């Protein structure tokens, strides 16, 4: 595919996506704070995965990302009204934006859980083997621990989505020894060694990984 064709395709996808007020407000919040957020293609993929997997877990979906408002909006529209969405984010302003977005969609407040903390600090408290989907956009240095914790809470058949985790391919550069690159590199090695996870590495953002936990 040529670069011009690729750019045309992306424009077409964007043109076919008309954000409503809830999504537009969530995107505006992300832009105001300089937060990376999923584009239309990524958001639609997240919604599709959420729709496919939500019946698998009794505890719902975990969103661990600064852009929880944007991600949560895509996910919430794809799952049942009583599906719990747990947003984990240390910044209270981003949490409030996520809560506002989810409640604006008409979701019951009982289905929106906010955990104001670093994901790796609190995910160990979540119920094991009971979540249908875990979406994470975390620092590279935290990825190995995040993957370990996410694997523990996924229900069989559940999906782990790691956004922007391939660092535009720089993890293959042996001269990059900063903590985030080393952590991202270790995370990929961890995933490759898990024989009960089926992986797809996708060129969305700076590199996405979708990992599905095998059914028992």
Put a short name on every predicted segment.
Residues 1-133, 138-159, 165-216:
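A short alpha-helical cap/connector motif
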């Amino acid at each position: 595919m040529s670069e011009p064709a690729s750019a045309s395709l992306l424009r077409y996808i964007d043109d076919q996506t008309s954000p409503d007020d809830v999504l537009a407000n969530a995107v505006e919040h992300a832009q105001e704070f300089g937060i990376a957020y999923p584009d239309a293609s990524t958001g639609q993929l997240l919604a599709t995965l959420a729709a496919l997997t939500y019946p698998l877990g009794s505890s719902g979906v975990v969103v661990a990302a600064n852009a929880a408002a944007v991600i949560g909006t895509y996910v919430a529209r794809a799952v049942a009204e009583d599906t719990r969405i747990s947003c984990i984010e240390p910044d209270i302003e981003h949490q409030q934006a996520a809560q506002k977005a989810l409640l604006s969609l008409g979701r019951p407040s009982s289905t929106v859980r906010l955990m104001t903390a670093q994901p790796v600090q609190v995910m160990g408290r979540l119920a094991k083997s009971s979540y249908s989907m875990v979406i994470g956009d975390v620092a590279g240095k935290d990825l190995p621990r995040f993957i370990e914790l996410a694997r523990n809470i996924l229900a069989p058949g559940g999906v782990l989505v790691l956004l922007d985790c391939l660092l535009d391919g720089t993890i293959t550069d042996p001269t990059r020894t900063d903590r985030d690159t080393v952590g991202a590199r270790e995370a990929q090695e961890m995933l490759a060694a898990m024989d009960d996870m089926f992986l797809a590495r996708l060129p969305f953002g700076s590199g996405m990984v979708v990992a599905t936990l095998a059914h028992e």
